[in-house]
Amino acid sequence: LSAGIPGLTDDERRQVESKITDIEGEIQPGGNDEDIKLALLAEMMIATASAKLSEKQVEIKSAIYMEVLRDVPAWAMRRALRKWYAGKIAGVAEDQFNWAPSSALLLRACDDELREHREALADLKLLLDVKHIDETIAELESPAKSNQQLRTL
């Protein structure tokens, strides 16, 4: 920050830290997310099935999707699938929406849903790292002074 602009107050810092905690909680899977994601996968397989899958095939496909999507919260997966069903995933050809997305494509769609949260989180963390210019100058000068003092010994 430039001279004359105050840094964050302690109260503002606590508010930013609280918001960071909230966002981190939102973007991490929690509680019953695994059950919800399994239900969403079952819905997806039924809605987009091009052929009848055996129970074993469904089990294997579900395990692959769950492994790929392990770090995705259920709400992001739900939003990504709703966009898939509506044909509104950027960069996907119209005819691809007739089938289930690959696990990689679904992960990309989930990441798209999480992007705004992750960007806000990065911005807030950066805000906490911002120091007043006088403090930065003092820190930069301090090691230089220490090095000079060591050289004179």
Give the location of each predicted region.
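Charged interaction scaffolds used for protein-protein
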Residues: L1-L153
